[in-house]
């Protein structure tokens, strides 16, 4: 897989460059469409046989690299792809920080093949690996992580998303004394930062997109962290209303057809088999993980984080275009 590291970095770079000029335009679907087109073109220039096993688009009716789509020149290694052309299209549309173009590669049949739906996610760094169990209440997990890290609960730092669906979790954590950092969007960046050396967070708990979950799992595994995840249907994420039930029923049918289970806890090894993983994230707007795209006197500057699981390397790549 390491031979694909440079092509992968170029793919996320091209998607970010396509989206960036529209920062602040207010139209997240336009931004997604530009990134998807650029990403597809870049993927089709790579000498490999790629297959999108999980991708974003269906939840919010955005453009997409569709699940099952074959990309690449048709020769070379067979590769599973998990993709989110822009994680945080709303943030780009509103001119806000922490938007990324992200993608992960792994050998064929290595990544969880699932619909684009909601996923509950729990991530810790290597020092707390083995201390999480998503089938337990969040409060139990927070206590177990604090114990594994040798920290009192009031020193534990949990990152999540500032979404109504997570308000109960935020309340649970704060009642324990845990310090909660609620981001507007961006759980891929939060997952990586949780596993980062000198990490700002000890644990990540979110309910977000399944594509971002599988992409995050690739980075978490490459960084030696731990993660568990659970697919949940639209009613469980958004509320049990009449208009949501049809979507939830369709999601459950798609899961059955793909051979995955709703409300089953998946371990990190079930999300990502093996360690031959590549993860790439290019900043669109500035954030904690990587810098956003910047206009300079000599051109446009991008910054990309490239993580290799086989050799557990992390590279920050600054490019001038």
UniProtKB/Swiss-Prot annotation:
Q: Name one GO molecular function term.
A: fructose 1,6-bisphosphate 1-phosphatase activity
Superkingdom, taxonomy of origin: Bacteria
Q: Could you tell me what reaction this enzyme catalyses?
A: beta-D-fructose 1,6-bisphosphate + H2O = beta-D-fructose 6-phosphate + phosphate
Q: How does activity depend on pH?
A: Optimum pH is 7.5-8.
Quote the SUPFAM superfamilies the UniProt record gives.
Answer: Carbohydrate phosphatase
Keywords on record: Carbohydrate metabolism, Hydrolase, Manganese, Metal-binding
The EC designation for this entry is 3.1.3.11
Name the InterPro entries for this protein.
FBPase_class-2/SBPase
Q: Where is the signal peptide?
A: none
Co-factor binding details: Manganese. Mg(2+), Co(2+), Ni(2+), Ca(2+), Cu(2+) and Zn(2+) cannot support activity.
Residues reported to bind substrate: 87-89, 118, 163-165, 185-187, 209
Look up the record and name the cofactor or cofactors this protein needs.
Mn(2+)
Residues reported to bind Mn(2+) 2: 84, 87, 212
What EC class does the entry list? hydrolase
Q: Which GO terms describe its biological process?
A: fructose 1,6-bisphosphate metabolic process; gluconeogenesis; glycerol metabolic process
- Regulation of activity: what does the record state? Competitively inhibited by low concentrations of phosphate (IC50 of 1.2 mM) and is also sensitive to Li(+) (IC50 of 15.8 mM). Also inhibited by 1 mM ATP or 50 mM KCl (60% and 20% residual activity, respectively). Slightly activated (40-50%) by the addition of 1 mM dithiothreitol in vitro.
Purpose of the protein: Catalyzes the hydrolysis of fructose 1,6-bisphosphate to fructose 6-phosphate. Also displays a low activity toward glucose 1,6-bisphosphate, and no activity against ribulose 1,5-bisphosphate, fructose 2,6-bisphosphate, or fructose 1-phosphate.
Record family assignment: Belongs to the FBPase class 2 family.
What else is noted? Answer: E.coli K12 also possesses a FBPase class 1 (Fbp), which is the primary FBPase in E.coli and probably represents the main gluconeogenic FBPase.
Give the quaternary structure.
Homodimer.
User: Under which name does UniProt file this protein?
Assistant: Fructose-1,6-bisphosphatase 2 class 2
Which organism encodes this protein?
Answer: Escherichia coli (strain K12)
